[in-house]
Swiss-Prot record:
Protein name as annotated: Dihydroxy-acid dehydratase 2
Binding site for Mg(2+): D88, D130, K131, E457
Keyword presence, Lyase: yes
Family to which this protein belongs: Belongs to the IlvD/Edd family.
Enzyme Commission (EC) number: 4.2.1.9
Annotated Pfam families: ILV_EDD_C (PF24877), ILVD_EDD_N (PF00920)
Species of the source: Corynebacterium efficiens (strain DSM 44549 / YS-314 / AJ 12310 / JCM 11189 / NBRC 100395)
Keyword line: 2Fe-2S, Amino-acid biosynthesis, Branched-chain amino acid biosynthesis, Iron, Iron-sulfur, Lyase, Magnesium, Metal-binding
Cofactor note (record): Binds 1 [2Fe-2S] cluster per subunit. This cluster acts as a Lewis acid cofactor.
Sites where the protein binds [2Fe-2S] cluster: C56, C129, C206
Subunit structure, as described in the record: Homodimer.
InterPro entries: DHAD_IlvD/Edd, Dihydro-acid_dehy_C, DihydroxyA_deHydtase, DiOHA_6PGluconate_deHydtase_CS, ILV_EDD_C, ILV_EDD_N, IlvD/EDD_N
Enzyme class: lyase
Active site: S483 (proton acceptor)
């Protein structure tokens, strides 16, 4: 931050508005609506991932309009532009999922490109789904301008009328689990159809504490979005208010000289980790928070997640493992209630600056209601689990680390024998054909950031495993990822990945594997001399996808243990 007297609220746009040499630039800006009274106003990029492909982003165009109103009212000039977004729900379980995590980098790069080429002074960044949220936050951290993030909001839960006459509250995850149940003969095709027609009743991101809601909560916790803005559903009128206030806020940040890296610090990122732990959030938060830290040039490692998780209890009884959705969190006060509970317990840093220009502690003064309700969000002294919802494992199978969502892991210890599959499709076939049995450890490899490429999510197969009724008897381990909606015994982000020669590449059918959550261990119980002999003859399968954007990505992407960032 700088002293108010030294602040230029047009730190970059003077490059296109000032002087004889910028006659042509001003001429073009006149054509989009600017005039003589606008040249001294800061130019604010209003970037959104709006599209008509997925309900997650449908209301962003409307919200961008209100954000622009807020910019105008505060004395700035908004200039709207768009970026891409990939729907994980639609892309799941097939070739399209190779592009999901890749889209995070494309979003970041595209926002940087427009903001830098057009010399915009600050930004309101709007997003509504799993990769667009971290992509926008990464862009804010990289650019280090005055920036505000605004979430689209989540959808409401649907109600499916089942063939037995009952009604069932459903989210998108129920559709994936219904596939496995139908193939296992425990659900009729009629009921699957009823679920399909009900899981997405309208616009907004998936309603549970899946990746989009996890990252929206993290954005609020780190101070990059307005207090209370993560929880309201997409259809709620509060979204309009938050959009307008976000536009006003970015202009005020410029006036005060507050930039993204004044807010995105190691301490604020640890606050975000703490909130994710308390909510039982998505494993993808590990990747995304480390990637945001990388762009902010802040040190955040896998070890930090365990250190925070040791102290922060799991409080949120939220789907996919719990009973409630984000709209329920909204009803009892939203993310500020979680943050206040953690602050009062000394588990987050109240001195961190936020986009309001105030600290976390100042923002949380006088919130109403002030405390968790005890049901949707438990009190600190009555948690669901005494430690956080995510755990980092290490061991001979994952010397570089692996991630497990312990909020829903039903056993402290699992010992079984390997069933090895190179990529997801043959493993899915094995599930749907009833070929797995209790005690199997399904190894899905060559799905890492480089090996996929793209580190695909495994929601289709975890949903099928649960739907088939073997979710508590079969363990799934992969160098790929899991959806925030995945449930059951699943461990992802295994590093080093198979294509880098990690031990996961050496596993063979029948090998004994031991996972001990209490010891944070994941081990391949095969003698090192045997593994060395296997390594001598190791041959990686050919990958037909190493062209176009996937080819570029595979050359640049780093390990999952570093957030799968590209450089």
């Amino acid at each position: 931050m700088t002293n108010d007297h030294d602040i230029d609220i047009k730190p970059r746009s003077r490059d296109v508005t000032d002087g004889l040499e910028r006659t042509a630039a001003r001429g073009m800006l006149r054509a989009v609506g600017m005039g003589d009274d606008d040249w001294e106003k800061p130019q604010i990029g209003v970037a959104s991932s709006w599209n008509e492909i997925t309900p997650c982003n449908l209301t962003l165009k409307k919200l961008a309009g209100f954000a622009k109103e807020g910019v105008h009212e505060a004395g700035g000039y908004p200039l709207e532009f768009g970026t891409i977004s990939v729907s994980d729900g639609i892309s799941m379980g097939h070739e399209g999922m190779h592009y999901s995590l890749v889209s995070r980098e494309v979003i970041t790069d595209s926002v940087e490109t427009v903001m830098s080429a057009e010399r915009l002074d600050g930004s309101v960044l709007l997003a509504g789904c799993d990769k667009s949220i971290p992509g926008m936050l990464m862009a804010a951290a990289r650019l280090n301008l005055s920036s505000v993030f605004l979430y689209n909001g989540s959808t409401m839960p649907g109600t499916a009328k089942m063939s037995d006459g009952t009604e069932r509250e459903v989210t998108l995850i129920d559709a994936f689990e219904a596939v496995g149940a139908c193939r296992a003969g425990t659900m009729s095709r009629e009921d699957v159809d009823a679920i399909e027609r009900s899981v997405c009743p309208g616009e907004g991101a998936c309603g549970g504490m899946y990746t989009a809601n996890t990252m929206a909560s993290a954005a609020e916790a780190m101070g990059m979005s307005l207090p209370g803005s993560a929880a309201p559903p997409a259809i709620h009128q509060d979204r309009t208010l938050y959009a307008r206030r976000s536009g006003e806020a970015v202009v005020e940040l410029l006036r005060r000289g507050i930039r993204a890296r004044d807010i995105i610090t190691r301490e604020s990122l640890l606050n975000a980790v703490a909130v994710v732990m308390a909510l039982g959030g998505s494993t993808n938060a590990v990747l995304h928070l480390m990637a945001i830290a990388h762009e902010a040039e802040v040190d955040l490692t896998l070890e930090d997640f365990n250190a925070v998780g040791d102290k922060v209890p799991h409080l949120g009884d939220l789907k996919p493992f719990g009973r409630y959705v984000m709209n329920d969190v909204f009803k009892i006060g939203g993310i500020p209630v979680v943050m206040k509970a953690l602050l009062d317990a000394g588990l987050i840093n109240g001195d961190c600056l936020t986009i309001t220009g105030r600290t976390v502690a100042e923002n949380l003064q006088g919130i109403n209601p002030p405390d968790p309700d005890g049901q949707i969000l438990r009190a600190i002294d009555n948690p669901i689990h005494k430690t956080g919802g995510l755990t980092i494992l290490h061991g001979s199978l994952a010397p570089g680390g692996a991630v497990v969502k312990t909020a829903g892991f039903d056993t402290e210890r699992f010992e079984g024998t390997a069933r090895v599959f190179n990529q997801e499709a043959p493993a899915m076939d094995a599930v749907l054909n009833g070929e797995l049995k209790a005690g199997d450890v399904v190894i899905i490899r060559y799905e890492g950031p480089k090996g996929g490429p793209g580190m695909r999510e495994m929601l289709a197969i975890t949903g099928a495993i649960k739907g088939a009724g073997i979710g508590k008897e079969v363990l799934l381990i992969t160098d790929g990822r899991f959806s925030g909606g995945s449930t059951g015994l699943c461990i992802g982000h295994v590093a080093p990945e198979a294509v880098d020669g990690g031990p996961i590449a050496l596993v063979e059918d029948g090998d004994p594997i031991l996972v001990d959550i209490s010891q944070r261990r994941i081990d391949l119980l095969v003698d090192e001399s045997i593994l060395e002999e296997r390594r001598k003859t190791l041959q990686h399968p050919e990958n037909p996808r190493l062209h176009g954007v996937l080819g570029k990505y595979a050359k640049l992407v780093q390990s999952a243990s570093m957030g799968a960032v590209c450089f």
